[in-house]
């Protein structure tokens, strides 16, 4: 009986150690011009699981990534990268994260990260006040994800 308990404990420890190895890294490029127009994240819709990392890469100069106030899951920490620097975000909280390029937000440069299934805060993000061009691009991003 004791050997069985030890084997289960060892299996549990191995499973916990292997979990980070299963995490995915998703690259997102920050571009002056992309398939969807000017000032874009590609992809603009990112599907991730808790524990995954999202690496934002400023392919063109002048970009960063920043969380938008009240448009990330409850319990998630806000973040902001420096201009022209790669930024690695580990997503831990399930839900939707709306992010922006700070200098180009007024031009609609946003991306949506959906962590887990059916992000609970997506309706809140969609209905929140934001510039018209941002709302239009967000609606396109959501439609492309379906």
Swiss-Prot record:
Cu cation binds at residues 63, 101, 104, 109. Residues 28-116 form the Plastocyanin-like domain. Its cofactor is Cu cation. CDD domains: Pseudoazurin. It is found in: Periplasm. Residues 1-23 form the signal peptide. This is Pseudoazurin.
